[in-house]
Amino acid sequence: MRCLLCLCLCLFVAGFAGCRRQSSAEITIAHEVSPQPPRVGRLLIVLRITSASRKPVMGARVRLEANMSHAGMSPVFAGTLEVAPGDYRANMEIPMAGDWVILVHLTLPDGEKLERQFEIKGVAPA
């Protein structure tokens, strides 16, 4: 009887272990910026968001925030549109030459929020 109870408990715990939520650390965001090299004005930013199993993350809410790498410039914001499963596109107006840090504010379909960042170095004058 004791062995049966132990077996049932082990199966119960194993069942929950298989149902764990995907960790935000397992989300990958790849980015492409055009034109190349980047210039002051409108940039097209395409994000490809995938899970650890390389499946596209669909239905996320994604906003971008661009900040210059030095103080003194107001941030620039842009929304995104999901144009294909896991592919999100934004048009962002970059008003000044220099180095920019892009923050990706991401809300997953289950409501979990996370942030990632990447740099756009050497934005040239228009």
PLM feature spans:
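Positively charged n-region of N-terminal signal peptides that target proteins for export
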Residues: M1-L4
